[in-house]
Amino acid sequence: MSSEVLDMLRNDEHYYGEYGRQFLSNSDIGALLNNPRQFHERKPETKPLIEGRFFHTALLEPNKLGEFMIVNCASRNTNIYKDAVAQSGQEILLLKNEADELLSLTQTMKQNLRFFESIYAPGNEYEKPGIQTIKGLQWKGKADIVMHSEGVLIDIKTSGRIDDFKWSARKYNYDSQCYLYQMIFGMPLVFYVIEKETHRLGIYTPSEDFLRSGELKVEQAVEVYNKYFSPESEDSIRNYYIEEVL
């Protein structure tokens, strides 16, 4: 694994930008399985995406919070917000009340002994990139936390309803994430989850069945990629269609 490649992938602009597109990632699974026409299409910035980045940064790399522009206004319909967006050149910015709530979530995690001791254990690495050849293709991943003392990866998630997390995890392809990250980093992945409204906390450890489900998704995604997008492909995405029996 080239150290130069990993150094490039540490930078989010490279990881999520043109350089990083030479590798597949778990975020490609959804498009390849559900709508291959959207594979590698640029995804617009959304409120959940920027909230997720802010939350992770506040918890794991608080020294980088200054990179976020926060707007102190009541809503996105105000001229203050519209002017700030125009000046920033970004598609969407966080409101101060949204940032405050996200910071509150991080405080809840830090105040829980188990969460604090795991997230900030001595020797932990944060936002660590990795690449690996899996099923014949190059995949990338970026681990939130590598907890060397326990030999596990920790992935931080927020949830609208933590009671549903066990069931929604497959819907959001967390099963394929677990499989890919275990292959890339050589460690199992565990989810540390906080419910947005109530701040309830949960720890979710993948089962063998969950990992197998993820591996099957990766195999299916690789099949679609090889059919339509690989350099050796003799088919075109224009020929893609869905066929089902009603």
Task: Give each language-model segment a name.
Residues K128-G130, K157-T158, V193:
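Short, structured patches in soluble enzyme cores that scaffold and shape functional sites
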Residues I50, K140, N173-S176, L180, ...:
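Short, well-structured alpha-helical interface segments that form or flank functional binding sites
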Residues W167-S168, L180-L246:
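Metal-dependent nuclease catalytic regions and adjoining charged, substrate-binding loops involved
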Residues K43-P44, Q90-L94, D163-Y172, S207-F210:
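Short histidine-centered catalytic/ligand-binding loop motif
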Residues G136-K140, M147-G151, M187, T198-H199:
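Coil-to-beta-strand transition motifs
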Residues L65-E67, L153, M187-Y192:
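Substrate-binding/catalytic groove segments of enzymes
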Residues G141-F165, Y181:
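Conserved catalytic cores of phosphodiester-cleaving nucleases, focusing on short active-site segments
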